[in-house]
Amino acid sequence: MASISRILPTDGRLSQCRINTSWVPSTTRTQTHLDFPKLVSVSNSGISLRIQNSKPISPVFALEATSSRRVVCKAAAGVSGDLPESTPKELSQYEKIIELLTTLFPLWVILGTLVGIFKPSLVTWLETDLFTLGLGFLMLSMGLTLTFEDFRRCLRNPWTVGVGFLAQYMIKPILGFLIAMTLKLSAPLATGLILVSCCPGGQASNVATYISKGNVALSVLMTTCSTIGAIIMTPLLTKLLAGQLVPVDAAGLALSTFQVVLVPTIIGVLANEFFPKFTSKIITVTPLIGVILTTLLCASPIGQVADVLKTQGAQLILPVALLHAAAFAIGYWISKFSFGESTSRTISIECGMQSSALGFLLAQKHFTNPLVAVPSAVSVVCMALGGSGLAVFWRNLPIPADDKDDFKE
């Protein structure tokens, strides 16, 4: 669902707008009310604002962005005059459908789970090779939404992105190990739980962040960074934490992660950077494909381990649900020490939502015991339902008006 995040509105940013100066008494007054006086030019025909990658402007403008980054500029309280009202062009019918399908993601997961358990033959055709292609396409679609500038933004936000990265690869793996040892899971099930806890952030986290009123741009950056880091962190942590339980082929895990995750992402970024006209055409269809593929990648693991789930699924629900719930909570409260509410929600969701599909694929390819893959299959359901439930809960809690902005464009 990485490509789906392209249609989700991110934080408003002003690209360019022109304002009639008839309501502005003087240049001095204008500069008093603007956060960026050096970027304002005044002429007889009006005030020109030209900003690139600037922070949101406040309190003079209320910004509202759509997928094509159209912006509405409105006069704020305390500034007199009549600024003509305008409204952004509405989403197309296709974009509305994609947004609806995306926000109903938990429903598709539930339906996919039921199909996987009771009619597994409908989804088990998506075996290892096809599963690999599907996951690779999702990584490619995420890359198609990124540019070199997005990686420069990571460098401008080292602390914010870094905390999310550490939460992803420190809090979650330790939680997975402690839960597996405390509940005394069998070696293959414990290994599977540790493996999925060491996987990078899931693409569905971008959608959950959008629903929760978090910072979608930051969510995409964190998912990207953890995805790139997975080539080293996932095999290294799995070997470190689960190596004493079962043999772990760290080199094989690294190679598979590189092939399935990193290569498609890099190809997508390069294509978007050097062939933007071509990718702009492709990107119109990738969201719909992303919705379908993500649903299949959630349903297929359930179908492939349906027999095991019917006999041992109950004993896995508690540890997997506990893993995600604890990650959501710890990620949020640690973030609250340094960041505002919006950023804390974003880091919490990133910490709690893993790429369970990647965990399932790695378990199938590199572990002989089929039980190792079962925790990842259960995680697909727990992660989607827990993350979306938390997002809906937060959506009904307003972000404080004085919430600090921790994200630098």
From Swiss-Prot:
Pfam families: SBF
Transit peptide feature, positions: 1-74
A Gene Ontology molecular function term of the record: pyruvate transmembrane transporter activity
GO terms (BP aspect): plasma membrane pyruvate transport
Function of the protein: Sodium-coupled metabolite transporter that plays a crucial role in pyruvate transport across the chloroplast envelope. Is required for sodium-coupled pyruvate import into plastids.
Family to which this protein belongs: Belongs to the bile acid:sodium symporter (BASS) (TC 2.A.28) family.
GO CC annotation terms, alphabetical: chloroplast envelope; chloroplast thylakoid; membrane
Gene3D superfamilies: 1.20.1530.20
Tissues in which the UniProt entry reports expression: Expressed in developing leaves.
Origin superkingdom: Eukaryota
Gene that encodes it: BASS2
Signal peptide as annotated in the record: none
Transmembrane segments: 97-117, 128-148, 161-181, 185-205, 216-236, 250-270, 282-302, 314-334, 374-394
Recorded topology in the membrane: Multi-pass membrane protein
Keywords tagged on the record: Acetylation, Chloroplast, Membrane, Plastid, Transit peptide, Transmembrane, Transmembrane helix, Transport
Residues where N-acetylalanine is found: 75
Compartment(s) of residence: Membrane; Plastid, Chloroplast envelope
Protein name: Sodium/pyruvate cotransporter BASS2, chloroplastic
Summary of the knockout phenotype: No visible phenotype under normal growth conditions, but plants show increased sensitivity to mevastatin, an inhibitor of cytosolic isopentenyl diphosphate biosynthesis. Chloroplasts isolated from mutant plants lack sodium-dependent pyruvate uptake activity.
